[in-house]
Amino acid sequence: MIYHRIAVNVPLSDGLLTYSHSEPLPPGTRVLVPFRNKTVVGMVWETDIAPDMDAARILSVQTVFVEEKPLSQSWRDLLAFTSRYYHYPTGQAVFAALPQGLKETRAVEMPQPPLFYALNEAGRAQTPPPARFNKKAALWDALLSGEMTMAALKQANAQAAKLIEDWAEQGWIETTEAAKPVLRPYRGQASHSEFVLNTGQQKASDEIQTALGRFRSFLLYGITGSGKTEVYFDAMAKVLAQGRQVLFLLPEINLTPQLLKRVENRFADVPTAVLHSRMAAGRRTQDYLRAMLGQAKLVIGTRLAVFTPLPDVGLIVVDEEHDGSFKQDNELRYHARDLAVWRAKQGGCPVVLGSATPSLESWHKAQSGAYRLLQLTERAHASAQLPQVDILNIGRLKLDNGFSPQALQLLKQNFEAGGMSLVYLNRRGFAPALFCGDCGHTFGCPNCSAKMVLHQRARQLRCHHCDHREPIPFKCPDCGNQDLTAVGHGTQRVEETLRAFLPKAAVVRVDRDSTAHKNDWADLYRRIANDEIDILVGTQMLAKGHDFARLNLVIVLNADGSLYSADFRAPERLFAELMQVSGRAGRADKPGKVLIQTQLPEHPVFAAVKAQDYAVFAENELNERQMFAMPPFGFQTAVRADAPRVADAMEFLNAAKETLAPLLPESVSRFGAAPMLMVRLAERERAQVFLESTSRQDLHRAVSLWVQVLQQNRDGKIRWSVDVDPQEA
């Protein structure tokens, strides 16, 4: 018998178990193995090993999926690194990185190579369709130009499938399964103004292209509207024309439809895979496998796509690299941006991190020379100007449901002038809280230490942390008062205020509640493109990367909230949020205006936003962090525990802390145990210990010791986790 180490999705120390098989199995092969009286999926990690246990106790592999291609050594190296760095069992890390189809106990069908269509010799001898049949003629010209996929042909003519079927019956079409040696992303459109870069864009793209074929990290810092996407696309075109693969990571699912439209216009004949959580499981698995087999040349996805196996990656792009969505906040707590840089080094290719407001970690690396800084200082359209930003002190103003008189006047003027406006606040629901004016009672979530949010249309109170829901009460449970008051300004309340103030305006609310379905974003883009919307009411998701050409006024209602946070990253996040949302104004050739309402107008964040000066803000913030050895000058790990009572969680962490005190490196500081800022979540109470050090190596040694002690926990009431490079306090 041959013995193998098999990765299994179980919370053991490393998740690797020993099984036997009559033959050596290639590492990366998917198998079925017995585990605790059931059959589970496993993946061969090592083969032909010497077992460290009694051979009589070793169980046999039950099924080998021989028709499936094993996952590559480079993919397994990525998961091994991820497991080590984030101190997470290898077996569980492997299965966190796989699509649903590869986690199931049945075989998956491997995707077939794409078909390519062209006119054969007989077809080329035919008379082309008359020019008056312009779409049919366009399809014929496309087939004349060489082998093309059906997706690309449908760009020329939506009826391509039917026409090609007809022409094939005439004996004019040839099909091949072979991948084209050269992809042509510029087909017939090189002179299109959208693809012509300005001087700054061309310089940035040229520098990226000089690094093709070797590892180099670039930080592409460009003001909003400077055309970072065009720089990405220009560099991507060079890689795709070589037949190599590109990985393009986005922070949010809702950015995907807009990007895909641009990809279809620019790279119509490039086989593309799209990977995000709202895709059907079967489609996502097939796209994953197409990428693994090298059939998909362009892979676009959210954070989990960083684990997509790519046999011939030539470029990795991380758009909006500062965005917190790239950090997974449960189970395998990885950061996709950081893993993308590691993958680029592993694959020997450039990685481009792009943002108008880079993370301070990336900016610091660019300033220190670890990353090459590329800057776009002008908007892509020569006529486009940066928006005028005004900071309004609302401390003594009377507000109408959150709106100052100045804000309402600007909205009215812009509507009458035919412009589009965005009213921005980072709060879903009708109002943040329901309040009893007689006794002061507020309605808290029974499962969390958070207030319930009033959703008027659904007639519900909801917790935005654990999703607990209950009907709106008729009276106060403490004093019986029936006159309950909604306090605060959520998107639903703002929407209703605007409808009453401007009844003729088309007001559309955009938040997670209103975009929960698959096609909601595509429908929104269609309505905006057709000038069917006058005012958008939005939350944070509207601040990210969207390009709405007609938008020329942004009103920010509640800019102060995050500044009261205990999180040291709060100013950085607020600055990025305000800069990003301000950048939505004045795209294309329309001058933009931004009005930010605040009760803290003297705060340095607002001065930096008004000046539109990221570099000054970053320098000041980095100087402050350096004084206290905070990231990026120091490194952090949060060790967390939760239990029915916070006292139990703290006792568990403090016991481990006491055990480890004499063993930890002196360079590692320990803070806590202390309750988390939101103590109660989903009927569990949480505490944490922060480990900090200026030595990443010493910190990881300390975390390894902590994990060894925590793994000895046998108290079923206690759950623990480790968060390396945490983004939340």
Curated annotation (Swiss-Prot):
ATP binds at G222, I223, T224, G225, S226, G227, K228, T229. It comes from the Bacteria. A motif (DEAH box) lies at residues 319-322. Residues 209-376 form the Helicase ATP-binding domain. It is an enzyme of class 5 (isomerase). Zn(2+) 2 binds at C445, C448, C463, C466. One of its GO terms (biological process) is double-strand break repair. Disruption phenotype: Growth deficient on solid media due to a reduced growth rate, 10,000-reduced DNA transformation efficiency, 10-fold increased sensitivity to UV light and oxidative stress, greater than 10,000-fold reduction in ability to survive nalidixic acid (generates DNA double-strand breaks). Does not play a role in homologous recombination-mediated pilin antigenic variation. Its cofactor is Zn(2+). It catalyses: Couples ATP hydrolysis with the unwinding of duplex DNA by translocating in the 3'-5' direction; ATP + H2O = ADP + phosphate + H(+). GO terms for cellular component: primosome complex. Helicase and ATPase activities on forked DNA are stimulated by PriB; E.coli PriB does not stimulate this helicase. PriA:PriB complex-catalyzed duplex DNA winding is inhibited by CGS 15943 (CHEBI:131351). CGS 15943 decreases ATP hydrolysis and decreases PriA's affinity for DNA. Pfam families: DEAD (PF00270), Helicase_C (PF00271), PriA_3primeBD (PF17764), PriA_C (PF18074), Zn_ribbon_PriA (PF18319). Disulfide bonds: none annotated. Binds 2 zinc ions per subunit. The keyword Zinc applies. Its EC number is 5.6.2.4. Keywords: ATP-binding, DNA replication, DNA-binding, Helicase, Hydrolase, Isomerase, Metal-binding, Nucleotide-binding, Primosome, Zinc. Zn(2+) 1 binds at C436, C439, C476, C479. Residues 471-623 form the Helicase C-terminal domain. GO terms for molecular function: 3'-5' DNA helicase activity; ATP binding; ATP hydrolysis activity; DNA binding; zinc ion binding. Initiates the restart of stalled replication forks, which reloads the replicative helicase on sites other than the origin of replication. Recognizes and binds to abandoned replication forks and remodels them to uncover a helicase loading site. Promotes assembly of the primosome at these replication forks. DNA helicase with greatest unwinding activity on forked DNA substrates with relatively short duplex lagging strand arms. A DNA-dependent ATPase. Required for DNA transformation and DNA repair. Binds single-stranded (ss)DNA and replication fork-like DNA but not double-stranded (ds)DNA. Belongs to the helicase family. PriA subfamily. Interacts with PriB with high affinity in the absence of DNA. Component of the replication restart primosome. This is Replication restart protein PriA.
